[in-house]
Amino acid sequence: MRIFARLALLLLPLMLGGCRFENPLTTSPSEDLNTWLLGEWQLKEKGGMSTAVVAPVSGDRYSVHLSLAPKGGGGRQDYDFEAWASRVGNSVFFTLRNLKISANLPEGAHVFLHAQMIDQGTVRLRPLQLDSPENATGLELRKEIRSRLKDGSLYVEDSAKDWKRVAEVYWTKEGETGLFQPLRHAMPPATKKP
């Protein structure tokens, strides 16, 4: 059983989108909200369905609730994050700060990822491959990211995950999150050509 627990601890950073760190890439958001990222997202995996609900907290911060499919017979793993955009050079990454204690991720730990909108209903998330120690400063992390962007080694090969949006979330002018509703213009499923 301990082997499975240790394996889960090793795999968790990859599932969440990167290694965990004590410090954020940037201490405050570099950009306003990207409303294309708001909504309920799903990822079909061998162990089941993982879901992420991304809602606005303010004009530049997100609330992310992540519920990962069970791995190896275990139960679902739920996480709550505060997230914001962190610009490094010309690239934008997301800093996610864990808001509650969990067995696999300490409260206050930071995880980084790159999000790429493929179309209105698909976002591709890629973990970052960083060798910096857990206590690296934001400046040290950004320096390593710039270096890895230049040499093409920032992203873990074949680790990108395509999440599908299944519902939208609306943000009212008063700053409250509106109700989740089915997509107004859902993308038709891709048809395979014979």
For the regions a language model picked out, list residue spans one by one.
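C-terminal motif of bacterial Sec signal peptides marking the signal peptidase cleavage site
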Residues: 16-18
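Calycin-type beta-barrel ligand-binding domains and close structural analogs
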Residues: 20-36, 44-194
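Sec-dependent signal peptide recognition
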Residues: 2-10
